């Protein structure tokens, strides 16, 4: 796995961070809300920067693949965080479609490596 893929995965995790930060900010007020909004700003900045870096250099990931994988990692992480942190429901169909995202990310990584 190249450094670009590692950067992309970390960027996707920061995408989860900015989505969770927004969710937490919605459920707080005052000074605590501002801390969550600051976490959002930092997370979104790092996420976008790492996505940008993953698409450059000698081992550049194609933009379409990078964006799809980045978004999927963020979506998967956000669903898992929502279940754990916000007590969102765990249903068969939710887990089924989440697993299709995981399979798609793996497939994109495989075909982009060739």
Say what each PLM segment does.
Residues 1-114:
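Polytopic alpha-helical membrane proteins, predominantly small-molecule transporters/carriers
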């Amino acid at each position: 796995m190249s450094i670009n893929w590692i950067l992309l995965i970390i960027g996707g995790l920061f995408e989860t961070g900015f989505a969770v930060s927004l969710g937490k900010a919605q459920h707080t007020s005052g000074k605590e809300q501002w801390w969550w909004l600051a976490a959002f700003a930092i997370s979104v900045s790092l996420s976008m920067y790492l996505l940008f870096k993953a698409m450059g250099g000698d081992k550049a990931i194609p933009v379409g693949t990078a964006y799809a994988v980045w978004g999927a990692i963020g979506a998967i992480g956000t669903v898992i965080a929502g279940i754990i942190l916000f007590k969102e429901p765990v249903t068969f169909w939710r887990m089924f479609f989440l697993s299709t995202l995981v399979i798609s990310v793996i497939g994109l990584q495989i075909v982009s490596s060739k």
